[in-house]
Amino acid sequence: LDKNWELIEKYPYIIGDFSWTAWDYLGEAGIGKINYEETNSMSFYAPYPYKAAYCGDMNLIGDRRPISYWREIIWGLRDKPYVSAQPPQHHDDPHNMTFWSLTDAVRSWNWKGCEGKPITVEVYADADEAELFVNGKSVERKKIGEKKKFIAYFETTYEPGEVEAVVYRNGVETGRDKIVTASDDVQIKAYADCGCVPADESDIAYVEIAMGDANGNLN
């Protein structure tokens, strides 16, 4: 998308681009998987328990995956940077990706049992540079877009607390974002998409259930 969007903005006769896909779907199970097991071969589909294609900007219940924020930044619709982290359990594992595979990074800093292990942090931003801080200590400051446009990849060591990114343009801070480890006071919360429904069979309510702490940090 990052390369295509440059062409779209440059040439007025290009009307847009097509991304597969916005909302994940049932079927074509696992075409967007990242395979950490069969590194010598890569089939089109994935076996059970895969059910969804796993290539959407949003998952089956409509929650946005990190890649959707990267696209939003490219389109010029988001000014604030966005931080996510790749699962440290697979940091050094060889892997295969399909044409539809997206990053497996998630917006979480909850990796119990992985303390002291290496972890990759992804920072999405429309800026020149990004600086990463873990619990207030600077890890590194680097240019954005060295590997992929609008992204800076940082290597650090996981420790509970918070990871924060500060981005700069022309040396001046233009934004920051962070994710925080949820505390141990886990709470289960339910969020309905509407205030009330009729007591009959004519309507439906979707209720999202989440686990997090008192400050709203998801666990």
Locations of the language-model features?
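Substrate-binding clefts and catalytic carboxylate motifs of secreted carbohydrate-active enzymes
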Residues: L1-E201, A214-N219
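Short, solvent-exposed loop/turn segments enriched in Ser/Thr/Gly
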Residues: E201-V207
